[in-house]
From Swiss-Prot:
It comes from Papaver somniferum. NADPH binds at residues 27, 51, 187, 214, 216, 264, 269. The gene is COR1.5. Optimum temperature is 30-42 degrees Celsius. One of its GO terms (cellular component) is cytosol. Keywords: Alkaloid metabolism, Cytoplasm, NADP, Oxidoreductase. This is NADPH-dependent codeinone reductase 1-5. It catalyses: codeine + NADP(+) = codeinone + NADPH + H(+); neopine + NADP(+) = neopinone + NADPH + H(+); morphine + NADP(+) = morphinone + NADPH + H(+); neomorphine + NADP(+) = neomorphinone + NADPH + H(+).
Length: 321
């Protein structure tokens, strides 16, 4: 366990990752001094894992914060941090993976990433990131060649580990059928309102660590929901344990054997979110949470197309109607 109280998880490749990270998606202060100061404050209070992506447009600001943290002595070396970034869909082509990773490194002002993830199991026509994706730009991903390029990035030392995001059991199976090195992480939505039981069991059987996002319902994000934070069950447990609803939700994810990323620019909540590792939910608590109605918050609508690889949410997530 690190001095900040966050346990270290050993991934199947052997590298160690903090169980809790700070997410950087959907910040309202994108590219501003306030955003940089929030990242600096997170480092100061004890966060050592930061989760970014080319699509988030937060890499440059995070890079500035890391450089300033080193200058201020908040950390002694870059090696104290675990930095994750993601390959955007328009770069999910064999010849574009390495250049995309190198561009992320330039943005972050780093020599290497700790973890590089495929952002979605779909490709787009090459080009700059756009918020509104034309439906005819959505393409099937060639898992074999794209993953081989990811493996090459790791071999070259530009990233210490590689993984995926938003992959179902079926899509993981397809990718691993031709992979030399399996993904070490699958980052997906997971919370008390989306347990992901089947996916968790599949990933555990294949030594893939799940990293949960939207643990608190992603309130404030375009796809967010208040179902987690307004849950009566979680509120009752929180009162009984002397914890917050957020802490109960995060602790539940951790007790399922998953790692997690959460986001807050509020210093008090940053500190509160770190305090989930020195107590446990009881078997009774876990049973109550198991009965919470389930629903997915994140949507793949922007990656669906009548002419693309996935026409419906059910096809994208491999869920039955």
């Amino acid at each position: 366990m690190e001095s900040n109280g966050v346990p270290m998880i050993t991934l199947s490749s052997g590298i160690r990752m903090p169980a809790l990270g700070m997410g950087t998606v959907e910040t309202m202060e994108k590219g501003t001094e306030r955003e940089k100061l929030a990242f600096l404050k997170a480092i100061e209070v004890g966060y050592r894992h930061f989760d970014t992506a080319a699509a988030y447009q937060t890499e440059e600001c995070l890079g500035e914060a890391i450089a300033e943290a080193l200058q201020l002595g908040l950390i002694k070396s870059r090696d104290e941090l675990f930095i994750t970034s993601k390959l955007w869909c328009a770069d999910a082509h064999a010849d574009l993976v390495l250049p995309a990773l190198q561009n992320s490194l330039r943005n972050l002002k780093l020599d290497y990433l700790d973890l590089y993830l495929i952002h979605h199991p779909v490709s787009l026509k090459p080009g700059k990131f756009v918020n509104e994706i034309p439906k005819d730009h959505i393409l099937p991903m060639d898992y074999k060649s794209v993953w081989a390029a990811m493996e090459e990035c790791q071999t070259l030392g530009f990233t210490r580990a590689i993984g995926v995001c938003n992959f179902s059991c079926k899509k993981l199976q397809e990718l691993m059928a031709t992979a030399n090195s399996p993904p070490v992480v699958n980052q997906v939505e997971m919370s008390p309102t989306l347990h992901q039981k089947n996916l968790r069991e599949y990933c555990k059987a294949n030594n893939i660590m799940i990293t949960a996002h939207s643990v608190l319902g992603a309130v404030g994000a375009a796809w967010g929901t208040k179902a987690v934070m307004h849950s009566k069950v979680l509120h009752q447990i929180a009162v009984a344990r002397g914890k917050s609803v957020a802490q109960v939700s995060m602790r539940w994810v951790y007790q399922q054997g998953a790692s997690l990323v959460v986001k807050s620019f509020n210093e008090a909540r940053m500190k509160e979110n770190l305090k989930i590792f020195d107590w446990e939910l009881t078997a009774e608590d876990m049973e109550k949470i198991s009965e919470i109605p389930q629903s997915r918050t994140s949507s793949a609508a922007f990656l669906l197309s009548p002419t693309g690889p996935f026409k419906t949410e059910e096809e994208f997530w491999d869920e039955k109607d």
